[in-house]
Curated annotation (Swiss-Prot):
It comes from Saccharomyces cerevisiae (strain ATCC 204508 / S288c). It is a single-pass type I membrane protein. Residues 21-477 are extracellular. GO terms for cellular component: endoplasmic reticulum membrane. Residues 1-20 form the signal peptide. The keyword Lyase does not apply. This is Maintenance of telomere capping protein 6. The keyword Transmembrane applies.
Amino acid sequence: MWILIYLFIIWSSLRTWVTAVDSTTTVGDDLNETVSASVWPTMSPQMTVAFRSQRDVMGNLTIDQLPYVGLNLRRVLLNNETSMVNEGNNTRLLTLFKSMLSSEANAFVLDLEQYNNDLRVVDTTLLFSDVLTALQSFIFSTQNNLYANIIVLLLNISAPELDSTEYRHQNQTLNTTYILDKNLGNSFIYKPTDLQSDRAKNNTWNIYGKSSIDGWPTLGSVLYEQKKRLVIGELTDFFNETTAPYIFPHDVFHYEQGNSTLDCPSTVEGLTDLSSIHWRFLDSLFNSVDIKEYISCGLSPIISNSAYVNNVTQLADIIHEGSVWSWDSDQPSVTQSTSKSGSSSGTLEAYNCVLLYYFANNETVTWRVGNCYNSNIGLCRYENMAFRWLVRSNKATYFDFDSYQGSKCPDQYSFNIPRSPLEQRSFIAYMRNSSFSDTQIWIDLNSISVSNCWVSGGPYASCPYEKVISRRNFVTMMVPASVCSFALLCIVVYLSVLRVPIYDNRKNWRRVINKISKSELEGVPS
C-alpha cells in the first residue's frame, strides 16, 4: 500500500514537471514540421518564420491590399506542353499543385472550360472538382494560426461554341454552387455575401479609414475571426450573381497581362491613389530581380513563365524573391534565444529585436535581427496614416524606446513598422526627402516573449501561438508541489521504518489479554 502511495507521489511530481516543460515550448519546435509534398522544394525553417512574421505584420491590412505572388497554372503546369499532362498523369499534377499551395505562392489563375454540364481544366482531363478536392485537403491540413493564409483563385472560363440560346441555357444549368459545396465546402470561401455583411456591420476599411461603400475586411478578421481561407474571382464574364453566388465578378479585380498601365508611385499622393485600386494583379513573365520591383510598386505578380514548363520547380526561386519583401536574405535567425546573456565586455545581449537598415546610395531597406540592448533611433507613424513617418533622433534601447513609462515617439505618433511593400516604399521616400544617410532604425517587431515568434506591439507583446511561462513562474509553480511531495515521502519513510509501540510490545500485550481472560467467569449467569 505504501509503495503504491509512493509511486503515485512520484508520478504526480513528474506530471507537473512535464506539463510545465511543455508549456514553455516555443514556436521553434514546429519549424521542422511541414505540410508540403515532396515534389516542390519545401520552405526552410528560416523561410517559414520569415513568411509567417510577414503575414502577422500585415494582419491589420485589408485583403485587397495584400501583396500576392501567384502562378498562371495553364502557362506553367496545366498545358499540353507539360510531359505530365501528355502522359495523362493527373495524380502527379494534383500532387504538384498541392505542393505549390504549400509554397509561398498564394494566388492562382486557372483556365476552365464547360464540359458535359461540368467544368474541366483546359488542355487536361482534370475536372474542376479534382482541383477543389486538392485545395480542400490543403486547407484542412493548414487550418490553424501557424499555417493559415489567404488564397486567391482566379478563374478564366472558356465559353462553348454555341449559339446564344444554347449558351444561355448551358450557363444557367451549370451549378457552380453545388460543385463548390460538394468538393470544397462554402465555410472556407469568403463570398460576395460575406463582403456585403461586413460592409453592413462597418467592418471594412479603405485607405482613408472605415468605409461601408468600397472597403474590405482585414486579413486578421478574415483568417482568425471568420475562419475564411479562399477568395474566388472570375476574370471573364461567364457567370453572374445568380449562377455563381460564391464567386466575385471580374470588375472587382484590376487584372492586367503583359505590361502594367499603373505607374510606380514615388509620392504620398501617388501611393494613396494607387491604394484606392483594389486587387492589383499583373500576369506576365518575371525573373528573380524584377519581381521584387513590381512587388514594391504595389502590384501582385502572376508568374506565366512558360520556359519552365517541364521543370516547374525552378520557379521556386522567383516566387521566393517576390514573397519576402521585408527580411534580408539570411534573416531572421532561428537559433537565437530570448534569454539575456553577457558578452566578454560585460554588456547585455538579446538578439530578439528587429532593425530596419536603410541604404542611402541605392535607396533600399531590409530587416535584420539586432541586440535589443543596443541604442538606436526608432520609427514612428502618425496616427492611422499609412504613409506618414517620423524617425526620432534620440537613441534608446528597444526596451526604452517604447515602454510602460511612455514612448519616445511624440504625441499623435506611435512606435510602428512598415506593414506592406507600399508602406515600405513610402518610408524610403521619407528617408530620401529627409536626406538621411545609411541608418539603422528600431521597428515594432520582436521575439522577446518566445523565440522565433515575431510580434508587434512593443517589447511586452505576447506570442499568439504559445503560452509562455517564465523561469520565475516555473519556480513558483514547482515549489508547492515539490514541498508537498517531499513531506509525503518523509511520512511514508517514517511509517515504514519506525514501529508503533503497540506493535513493538505485541508479546507483552498478548500476555495481559490472556491473564484478563482467565479471570472472567465462564457460562451463563443464573
